[in-house]
């Protein structure tokens, strides 16, 4: 009887995977999710802020940003700040959140700071009752990463890299078993590449200005090397510098970091397109955890006391995503919608009924 039961279970599991393979209509086999901590929609869609780009209280050297970032036309300014976003993403993908067109993207949560924002992106819903601080507490909610990691096709093929040392708790590394490299974690294992060894050494020698957040080059190069070495099917990369430079009131460093992150994302995308496992089979989604204020003072901060801090943005590119460019239609979206969207792009149903609906425009 036990053997018959086990045999039936194996048959059902195998049958479900065969059925999924036969009915799947999407081309997406891999997902890369990238978050860009605390980057405002204002810079994304309008470039450098005219109030701050040459303010001596927010930049180190007067006039130092004008050559690289300033132009009277905001469409030109945004290209200077984000050349990859406003070339490849704008021509082949989708960008949401330009409120000048009534195209609104908001947090579902009402906290408007990092842990609640990341929980929302990764689990598909806000949980303001339990996720209401940035404390290092394991997330009680199951993220889309963890759901995928439980499925045989993705087991051991889910990886996450983050600059902030709270990500092992947000993703609940302990419960999920997902490989998470965050904060000041080093690459580990007996088969480290020369790149990993070098990044390990440099991370220990170059600490950066913050206690709980490493500089983004380390996060980026660990993730880039993982693509080449481990070929994950599901990859999450969380860049963090922009938020910390903003908290420090350094608008010049905020802009330079934003531009560098655009270059990092270009490198990730071009690396994916050069690999047969990923080319034409990978969707990349980019968003942020929260917005910021709009004045010279409130720009440094976010949270429920800052009215604009729940205003965010998102973008996507991939084989199943229509190339709509910058969306200029009126509408309301939330970052909570991305978890179910990712599952639909993979041809799967999201298992948590609490999750927000998918972004229907992101899938053909």
Where are the regions a protein language model picked out?
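Bacterial Sec-dependent N-terminal signal peptides
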Residues: 1-27
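Membrane-interface soluble catalytic domains
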Residues: 22-27, 151, 165-176, 270-280, ...
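Structural recognition of the beta-strand scaffold that forms the well-ordered cores
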Residues: 31-35, 42-43, 96-99, 120-122, ...
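Metal-dependent active-site segment of extracytoplasmic phospho-/sulfohydrolases and closely related
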Residues: 32-33, 41, 260-300, 342
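Short, structured active-site-proximal loop/turn typified by the sulfatase FGly-forming signature C/S-X-P-X-R
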Residues: 42, 46-111
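Short, solvent-exposed loop/turn and secondary-structure capping segments
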Residues: 42-48, 100-101, 132-134, 161, ...
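Acidic, His- and aromatic-enriched active-site or binding-groove loops in soluble protein domains
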Residues: 123-137, 177-211
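Active-site His/acidic residue clusters
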Residues: 173-175, 221-267
């Amino acid at each position: 009887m036990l053997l018959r039961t086990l045999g039936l279970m194996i048959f059902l599991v195998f049958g479900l995977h065969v059925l999924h393979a036969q009915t799947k209509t999407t081309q997406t086999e891999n997902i890369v999710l990238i978050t860009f901590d605390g980057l405002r929609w204002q810079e994304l869609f309008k470039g450098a802020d005219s109030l701050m780009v040459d303010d001596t209280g927010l930049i180190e050297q007067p006039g130092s940003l004008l050559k690289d970032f300033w132009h009277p036309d905001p469409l030109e300014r945004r290209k200077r700040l984000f050349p990859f976003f406003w070339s490849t993403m704008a021509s082949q993908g989708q960008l949401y959140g330009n409120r000048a067109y009534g195209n609104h993207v908001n947090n579902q949560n009402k906290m408007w700071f990092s842990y609640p924002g990341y929980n929302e992106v990764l689990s598909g819903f806000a949980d303001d009752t339990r996720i209401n601080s940035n404390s290092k507490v394991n997330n009680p909610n199951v993220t889309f990463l963890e759901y995928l990691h439980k499925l045989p096709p993705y087991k051991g093929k889910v990886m996450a890299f983050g600059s902030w040392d709270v990500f092992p708790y947000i993703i609940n590394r302990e419960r999920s078993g997902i490989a998470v490299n965050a904060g000041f974690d080093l690459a580990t294992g007996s088969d480290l590449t020369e790149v990993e060894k070098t990044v390990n050494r440099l991370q220990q020698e170059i600490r950066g200005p913050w206690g709980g957040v490493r500089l983004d080059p380390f996060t980026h190069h660990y993730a880039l090397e993982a693509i080449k070495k481990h070929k994950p099917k599901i990859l999450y990369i969380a860049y963090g510098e922009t938020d910390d430079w903003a908290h420090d009131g350094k608008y010049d460093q905020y802009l330079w970091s934003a531009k560098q992150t655009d270059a990092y994302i270009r490198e990730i995308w071009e690396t994916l397109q050069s690999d047969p496992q990923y080319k034409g089979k990978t969707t990349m989604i980019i968003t942020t955890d929260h917005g910021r204020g709009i004045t010279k003072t409130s720009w440094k901060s976010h949270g429920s006391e800052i009215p604009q801090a729940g205003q965010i943005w998102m973008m996507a590119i991939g084989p199943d995503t229509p190339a709509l460019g910058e969306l200029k239609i009126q509408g309301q979206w939330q970052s909570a919608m991305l978890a179910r969207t990712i599952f639909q792009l993979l041809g799967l149903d999201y298992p948590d009924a609490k999750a927000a609906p998918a972004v229907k425009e992101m899938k053909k």
